[in-house]
Amino acid sequence: MTRGIDLIEEVARHYGYDKFPPRLPPAKQPAHRLPHAEAQDRLRERIVALGYQEIVEIPIVDTQRNELFRPENLAPAVIGNPLAEDASVMRSTGTVSMLRAIEWNLNHGQRNLRLFEIGKTYELRDGAPIETQVLTLGATGMAQEKTIYEAAREFGFADLKGDLDRIGELAGGFAWQSGGPQWLAGSRAAQIALAAKSPDSANLGTTGQLAKRIADIYKFRQDVFVAELKLEPLVTGVEAANAARRFKPLPRFPAVERDFSLVLADGVAFAQVDAAIRSLQIAELESIEAADLFRGGQIPAGKFSLMIRVKFQSAEATFTDAQLNDISARIVAALQEKLGATLRAI
């Protein structure tokens, strides 16, 4: 015996190890939550409430699959001694892992999937590995199975966009712009930013339907939709929106809706219409919705008709016709000036 612990060991051995109660030693450091843990919990709760299941994927992926989604400006983080050919690089995007999970489930008979993952992506920058946390969503299959009450309906881009809007409500809302990376279908792809302007809000992520050439590589026989968002600016937006939240009393006066049937040039997005109206900073503005879209008939070629429904709510008094007419005139003037819109009817 050379140390005090040796004597303790001998005493314990003679006394009998089986006689010591099975207790863990007390923790010497207080437990603490990681940064943004509460905001991440709120995101998880919202996504699960929307019907998604959380997955945890291995971040080591196949090089060829990773190259399908790797942005050209990101250098891949290649593993020096890979255990297998299909596990030779750290993933550059969360999408490649999400599609692997969807592929496995489809091959095993699971046709209706709503999945999400919070995990890291990897790249090399100046020879050093960089890790970025992302939120990835994937969905495919039926949005509504056939019942005696409802007809069957496949999950579509509008369903995913609606789910993302619900998630974005936690961060003050999302701003949308059409288009996305080449692995998404051009007509069903969008870029997402936080509605609240900040240095990190401009390029939050992308979403859309998987392009046909990518779906063919995976041998998908049904439409697959994905979304990938940077987690750091998203949770920061959740925290900022939560801090700015204030109590709002229930309205005492009725809300009023006005419909505007507009004729717009092809290529004008609803997001532009929404932004043009909101730029007027009408205090009583409650919501703007796209109610109907029409092409053909008396609508000239190269144009389309969009009916929007605008809701107003005053906390001080019931609207008069004069007030509504004044607000409506301002909206029409703004749409004419900024988007070249013409009004069919109010």
What are these regions (language model features)?
Residues 1-113, 311-313, 319, 323-346:
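Extended, well-folded interaction surfaces typified by the phenylalanyl-tRNA synthetase beta subunit core
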Residues 4, 57, 64, 128-130, ...:
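A carboxyl-terminal module marker
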Residues 14-25, 29, 33, 75-80, ...:
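Residues forming anionic-ligand binding surfaces in small-molecule and nucleic-acid pockets
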Residues 20, 55, 118, 288-291:
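Generic beta-strand hydrophobic packing signal
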Residues 49-51, 73, 112, 131-133, ...:
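Short, well-ordered loop/turn elements at secondary-structure boundaries
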Residues 53-54, 77, 113-114, 136, ...:
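Structural motif
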Residues 60, 84, 120-123, 142, ...:
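Residues that form or immediately flank small-molecule/cofactor binding pockets and catalytic motifs
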Residues 82, 93, 119-121, 138-140, ...:
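Structured loops at beta-to-helix junctions and adjacent beta-edge loops in soluble globular domains
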